[in-house]
C-alpha cells in the first residue's frame, strides 16, 4: 500500500488506518466512483509522507509538522481548522481505536481535559460536589479558550451535565451520544424500532427523565429496544478499567446485534437503526453495520456531524480547512492540561499501558527526528 508504506519509510506514526486507506486511494487509484480535484492537498500530503521540504518543520516534541503553503488564490480564505474538545473523567484506561479517548478515532484535531475528582461513579450519580462542579466549568472554559469548534464527553453519563456545559460556552455541546436521538427518531416511522445499546441496561433507567427533558424523546416509548452489553464476554473489562480485547469482544457483540435485529424481523415493529450510548462501543460500529446492514449512530458519528457543520465540502468548499491541519493530533496524556495546583486532586493515576505507549512514542519521535535531521544535513553537504 503506497501511502502506508511511505508512512513507515518516513518514520511518521499515523494510527488511524482509515485515514491511511483514504490517503492511499487518493494517491493511487480513485476509481470511477470518486475524483480528487485539489492538487494542492495532494501536494501537501505528498510532502508530509516523503520528504521534509520548505513547507514542513519539527515541533519542540520532535513531531513532524506540516505547514500550509502560501495561498496564491485571493478568492480562497484559509480558515482555522475545526477541532474537538473532550471532557475526560478522572479515570484512565487503554482506549481502543474508535473510542472517544483515542485521538486516532477522529480525522481532525482533539483537545482533552481531565476533571480532577470527577470519577465514573460520581458521573453516574448525576450529582457534582461544588468543588468538582467548578473544575468541570473550568475545564469547559479551558477547551473553549483553545478555540475548539464543539465539546463532548468521554462517558455517556455526561448527559447529566449537558445543561451545565452549554451554560458555560457558546460552542455546540454534545456531552453524550444520546444527543442524536431526536434526529434518529425523526428519521423513522413511529411503528419502527430503534435499538439503544448501552454498557449496562439497568444503568440507563435512572436517566430516562433526563433524556426526555434534554432530548425531547421519551425512552419509555415502546419503539425503543434497550440492549445491555454487560453479559458480552470480554466487555466486563470496561467496568474494570482494563484494556478491552476488541478482537475477542467483536464477534460476541456482533452476534448480540444480529440476534436483537432478528428477534424483531418480520414483526410490526422491525428495528431500523441502532444507537450506541457507551463511548467504548464505537470500535464495533463498522462490524455491526456490515452484519446488520443498518445505520449505527455512536459518539463518533455525533462528533463528526457536529464538526462537519464547520467544514467545507471537499468538492466545492472555499475555506479549505484541511490545509490548516497537519494531520498530527495534539499529544495528550492523562492529567495533561490540568493546572498544577489541581493535579493533586486527581483520584486516579495514568494507566501503565498508556505510560508504556507514551514512552515508546517519545523514542520513535526522537529517532525519526534524528534520522531526518541527518538526512537534511547529508543533502546539504552533497550540494
Swiss-Prot record:
Catalysed reactions, as listed in the record: S,S-dimethyl-beta-propiothetin = acrylate + dimethyl sulfide + H(+)
Catalytic EC class: lyase
An MF annotation (GO) of this entry: dimethylpropiothetin dethiomethylase activity
EC number: 4.4.1.3
Keyword Disulfide bond: no
Keywords: Lyase
UniProt keyword annotation of ATP-binding present: no
Function: Mediates cleavage of dimethylsulfoniopropionate (DMSP) into dimethyl sulfide (DMS) and acrylate. DMS is the principal form by which sulfur is transported from oceans to the atmosphere and is a key component of the ocean sulfur cycle.
Family listed: Belongs to the aspartate/glutamate racemases family. ALMA1 subfamily.
Summary of subunit composition and partner proteins: Homotetramer.
Protein name: Dimethylsulfoniopropionate lyase 6
Organism: Emiliania huxleyi (strain CCMP1516)
Gene name of the record: ALMA6
